[in-house]
Amino acid sequence: IGDGSRYDDEFVVEGWGDGIAFNDAGPYDALLVNDARVLGRSGVQDDPNSAAARELVRLLSNRGVRVNNGWGSGQASPLAEVIGTVRSAPLSDIVNEMLINSDNNTAEMLLKELGVVESGQGTRVAGLPVIGRTLAEWGVSLDGVRVLDGSGLDPNNAFTCRAMLSLIH
């Protein structure tokens, strides 16, 4: 079972529209492998959790491990046995990779993680106030600023030149 329940199931931002969603960003969730791409299939898969589970089953099968009942997406039982863990790279490395590669999925997941840390809710909506509050604490005027996603891809985002200069300085 691919369990991405740390975050909600908003895999793309509604405001992106068809030109951006599943092309420039998304789908993304708390469990994401290869940006939801599966070997042997074109494009990204609709459900990143299922795609990650499918990739794990493929890798295990290639190593002679038999997996019964295939793969899927859902929430793991609290009684499930942990068979492995992965430690995250340091946040500074993640942000560096995001900035160098213009990684929109990482930007969106970091926004949801802000929501988890601040409110216990892994949602874009829960993360957005953290952005506004932080900018205000840094002395950035929010007049004319509208942040609707983590990547900046939503066409209704707005960031003024004055806010950008204030942020840089």
Short names for language-model regions:
Residues 1-36:
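Periplasmic/cell-envelope proteins involved in peptidoglycan metabolism and beta-lactam response
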Residues 37-169:
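A small/polar active-site loop signature that marks catalytic segments
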